[in-house]
């Protein structure tokens, strides 16, 4: 009888295991593959657990997939949505479908091209990049073409930088490199340390400006009439697009699923009041990329050090 009872008990355990989710969580936070976004995702995770008692799962996702998840109920929060990069997604999911909500608070940012001090002696503007005699200083593999990092392979901004290179004309005499950001930043460190010229895509807030004296390349101010970016859902969007001016004014905000906000209005208010500063975002980037802190460890310490502020976000 005891044997039969044990067998029945084990069968019940296995049956329950089959229907109950392992490590079930209350919400899903998308995590971008850049350091400040990784830190912010984990700060929201720890902060929400502390103030509302809900456990969040962190899922590494690009912004496009995050928006699809927000729209379909598979993702609840995206910590950094960059504009104007993702204005097409915002138009579709925020303005037209109303399935995604943007926080009213944004962090001012910018993006463009930067040069190391040695490169800036020769290359001062994007027009200089179209001069092969000047860009030969960027040639590191002796193939006759200079190299320039334009971003990580999965970033939308990387495709836009390729459009800009083609439109300005410097794409013809430069090898446009796409690699993950940590690899590129290591290359910047090495270039500055050895006095080797380097030009690369840059954005701020970012820790690289705490480490090095970089020069932002000059270019014509943004002009909507000269900035025609075809939606990335078109397979030929890069070849169909053109952009011969600087990026428009940039910012990033938190996004969350509208349905999630209705289900958890207290957390929606919390998200609406998150007010990271540019300096804080730079410190996040520095902590993860330079000090090599794990995102969850950094976030736990950040929430502890900013307990009063977290309380304020939750009470407003």
Task: Please report, for each region that a protein language model flagged, where it lies by residue.
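Short, well-ordered beta-strand elements
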Residues: 25-36, 54-59, 145-149, 271
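Ligand-binding pocket segment of bilobal, Venus flytrap-like solute-binding proteins
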Residues: 75-82, 149-228
